[in-house]
């Protein structure tokens, strides 16, 4: 006899659960049997009572239950979580070998069956973001197990910094906060600053104040891809953030790189990272609004750049704003295509799950038609494999990345 409260769901919810999707929405629940508290484990069953899975419940969330297992034999003790952590770490050691393992995403939420949990590694600091109550109430166990496993494997980890300063936690009935997590056995972690090496390039990372968890790891191999074709090019890197694409282009032999961001802090960090790597004679930061800058360059009929990189923030974070996002993506891509000479190169991407691949591709077709150019595709890429895409969970696929030659 199982001890968990039962949640009976609709046939629609049953179909989604059987297909492997871990989210049970509030409107899919028909009745419950037993008592529970938010954050508890509950069983999800069909309307006829057939077991579908076990997950975390939270009445504050539209996603009422987040499934973590479909195995009735699982016991959700420390051994269960340790097995799951080791599985995730072993996967990263396979797909992010050598030095890449010191700078990668260790846990990618639902794709690793840790719903609502992200853990990034930046050299000797782990950064975690917890967006589900079920993980929140178990994080002491999970984080200490993760620390133990990494230390056993010879990895030097001085602390875990929590970046829970995101409003989505409020929708889950949790508070916003950030700060060091107190491991059961660890020395004082010190300053929330570290240095990472990605693709042979060194960066300062501020895990306390940087965007999201401090540095965008999902473009690691896309940066390598643009470096291969940057030699001798005059590059315009738009929405540069910490200058990662700009620095990879410079390291690849670019003649000159202009790294643009609207944030003065981002431009300062880009310049500092360029100096750190001896690339400050090639990379120059520029504080500007990318939309305005591209318009100005088009109006001036500039032919200054023969390689343009567009890595904008997510223009849409919900299905209701996709149409506006398409207009924004089209505007910057159209202007970039107009600026590039025949034979020039364009790297462009979208990091929004809601901007579906087919929509992004159609937008690029429309922009190319309006610019009266043809696009020769060099590569179609996605997020790096430490951000794995679980086919049963389309929300885990979000980054679309293309490299074209304009012909």
Place the predicted regions along the sequence by residue.
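Non-catalytic accessory regions of SAM-dependent methyltransferases
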Residues: 1-123
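Non-catalytic substrate-recognition/targeting regions of SAM-dependent transferases
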Residues: 109-120, 140-215
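Conserved SAM-binding loop of SAM-dependent methyltransferases across substrates and taxa
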Residues: 228, 242-255
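Conserved class I S-adenosyl-L-methionine
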Residues: 232-241
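Conserved SAM-binding motif I beta-strand of class I
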Residues: 256-261
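S-adenosyl-L-methionine
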Residues: 265-309
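C-terminal catalytic and target-recognition region of SAM-dependent MTase-like enzymes
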Residues: 304, 331, 345-407
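Mobile active-site "lid"/loop adjacent to the S-adenosyl-L-methionine
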Residues: 305-335
């Amino acid at each position: 006899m199982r001890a968990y409260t039962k949640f009976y769901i609709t046939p629609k919810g049953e179909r989604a659960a059987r297909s492997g999707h871990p989210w049970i929405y509030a409107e899919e629940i028909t009745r419950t049997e037993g008592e529970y508290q938010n954050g508890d484990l509950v069983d999800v069953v069909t309307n006829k009572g057939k077991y579908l899975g076990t997950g975390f419940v939270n009445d504050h969330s539209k996603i009422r239950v987040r499934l973590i297992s479909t195995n009735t034999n699982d016991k959700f003790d420390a051994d269960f979580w340790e097995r799951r952590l080791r599985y995730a770490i072993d996967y990263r050691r396979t797909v992010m070998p050598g030095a890449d393992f010191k700078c990668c995403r260790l846990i990618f939420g639902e794709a690793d069956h840790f719903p609502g949990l992200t853990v990034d590694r930046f050299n000797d600091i782990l950064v975690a973001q917890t967006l589900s109550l079920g993980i929140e109430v178990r994080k002491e166990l999970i984080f200490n197990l993760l620390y133990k496993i990494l230390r056993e494997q010879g990895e030097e980890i001085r602390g875990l910094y929590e970046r829970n300063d995101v409003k989505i936690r409020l929708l889950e009935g949790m508070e916003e906060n950030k700060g060091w997590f107190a491991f059961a056995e660890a020395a004082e972690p010190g300053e929330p600053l570290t240095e990472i090496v990605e693709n042979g390039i060194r960066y300062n990372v501020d895990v306390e104040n940087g965007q999201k968890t401090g540095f965008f790891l999902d473009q690691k191999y896309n940066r390598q891809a643009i470096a291969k074709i940057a030699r001798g090019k005059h590059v315009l890197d738009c929405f540069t953030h910490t200058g990662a694409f700009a620095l990879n282009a410079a390291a690849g032999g670019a003649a000159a790189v202009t790294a643009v961001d609207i944030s003065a802090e981002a431009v300062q960090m880009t310049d500092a990272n360029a100096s750190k790597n001896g690339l400050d004679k090639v990379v120059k930061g520029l504080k500007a609004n990318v939309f305005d800058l591209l318009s100005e360059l088009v109006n001036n009929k500039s032919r200054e750049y023969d390689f343009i990189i567009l890595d904008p923030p997510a223009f849409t974070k919900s299905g209701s704003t996709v149409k506006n996002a398409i207009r924004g993506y089209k505007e910057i891509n159209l202007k970039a295509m107009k600026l590039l000479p025949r034979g020039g190169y364009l790297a462009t991407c979208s990091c929004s799950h809601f901007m579906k691949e087919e929509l992004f591709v159609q937008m690029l077709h429309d922009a190319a038609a309006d610019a009266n150019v043809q696009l020769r595709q060099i590569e179609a890429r996605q997020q790096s494999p430490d951000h794995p895409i679980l086919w049963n969970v389309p929300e885990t696929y979000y980054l679309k990345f293309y490299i074209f030659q304009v012909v």
